[in-house]
Curated annotation (Swiss-Prot):
It catalyses: cytidine(1402) in 16S rRNA + S-adenosyl-L-methionine = N(4)-methylcytidine(1402) in 16S rRNA + S-adenosyl-L-homocysteine + H(+). GO terms for molecular function: rRNA (cytosine-N4-)-methyltransferase activity. It comes from Methylococcus capsulatus (strain ATCC 33009 / NCIMB 11132 / Bath). Disulfide bonds: none annotated. This is Ribosomal RNA small subunit methyltransferase H. The keyword rRNA processing applies. InterPro entries: RsmH, SAM-dep_MeTrfase_MraW_recog, SAM-dependent_MTases_sf. The keyword Transferase applies. Keywords: Cytoplasm, Methyltransferase, rRNA processing, S-adenosyl-L-methionine, Transferase. Its EC number is 2.1.1.199. S-adenosyl-L-methionine binds at G25, G26, H27, D45, F72, D94, Q101. The lineage of its organism: Bacteria, Pseudomonadati, Pseudomonadota, Gammaproteobacteria, Methylococcales. Belongs to the methyltransferase superfamily. RsmH family.
Length: 301
């Protein structure tokens, strides 16, 4: 959704922008192409392989560009260290797992590739998916599968995991896929039986939804008046958080101590309806089929 991202960011030649999910640099390169000599772009990624890719592609040699290894919750710290708080003209968050992560068997994200059951977006993080599965309780696992994967057979799969790990460790993607296939009584001919479970475990291991919520809050704090927040989500759990956040900020509501409080001045204005990838992009990249882009603009105080 590159053209949609650029349209909603409305990149100015002298603006300051933050790409919170560098990946392999596609969005960052396009933003840099629209920046003049005074423009600045900060990229962030929690994956060290993505950070290394910035050097390999030559982007790190551009004086207008900088990259940091970190998470969404680090946005405020990185922006503040550059003296940009309240001056950022646009922030992009492209959620979920990246294509390079999915396609690399040793990262353990894909149920279609045999590899270690890792799933860490940040390889420096301590707990792998295999280690998490070895320790999580049956009740908590069922909750994660139900809440993060919307898996109708969450209880069956959780019970099967606990029974299997009593016999032997679950350490590879193949181990987990076989277990799931055996636990599910009915197969969906349009979806692999492991899809929801792999999504749920990945979200839990990486605290994706918690990081998203923190990142959205950080983003609004550092944006300039008129600055834009653009978020691409890939499943309903992510989109629900983004939609609710933008809606509540546009209404002047915020969560404090589990209770919504009303501000006198809303901080955001929602920019139109959510956008979807076009047919041409979906033909080139089928994973874009589920992408949904939402954008909002920060109001003047």
């Amino acid at each position: 959704m590159l053209s949609e991202v650029l349209e909603m960011l409305a990149v100015r030649p002298d603006g300051i922008y933050v790409d919170c999910t560098f990946g392999r640099g596609g969005h960052s390169r396009a933003i840099l192409e629209r920046l003049g000599p005074e423009g600045r772009l900060l990229a962030i990624d929690r994956d060290l392989e993505a950070v290394a890719a910035a050097g390999a592609t030559g982007l790190s040699a551009d004086a207008r560009f900088g990259i940091e290894h970190g998470r969404f919750s680090d946005v405020g710290r990185f922006v503040g260290a550059r003296g940009w708080t309240g001056r950022v003209d646009g922030i992009l968050m492209d959620l979920g797992v990246s294509s390079p992560q999915l396609d690399n068997a040793r990262r353990g994200f894909s149920f279609l590739r045999a590899g270690p059951l890792d799933m860490r977006m940040d390889p420096t993080q301590k707990t792998t998916a295999a280690e998490w599965l070895a320790e999580v309780s049956e009740r908590e696992l069922a909750r994660v599968l139900r809440d993060y994967g919307e898996e109708r057979f969450a209880g069956r799969i959780a019970r099967a995991v606990v029974e299997e790990r009593r016999r032997r460790p679950i350490v590879t993607t193949t181990d987990l896929v076989r277990l799931i296939e055996a636990a599910i009584p009915f197969k969906d001919k349009f979806k692999h039986p492991a899809t929801r479970t792999f999504q749920a475990i990945r979200i839990a291991v990486n605290d994706e939804l918690g990081q998203l919520q923190q990142g959205l809050n950080e983003a609004v704090e550092v944006l300039a008046a008129g600055g834009r927040l653009v978020v691409i989500s890939f499943h309903s759990l992510e989109d629900r958080i983004v939609k609710r956040f933008m809606r509540d900020e546009a209404r002047g509501r915020e969560m404090a101590g589990g209770i919504f409080e009303t501000r006198s001045c809303p901080r955001l204005a929602v920019l139109g309806k959510p956008l979807k990838a076009g047919d041409d992009e979906i033909r080139i990249n089928p994973r874009a089929r589920s992408a949904l882009l939402r954008a909002a603009e920060k109001r003047a105080a």
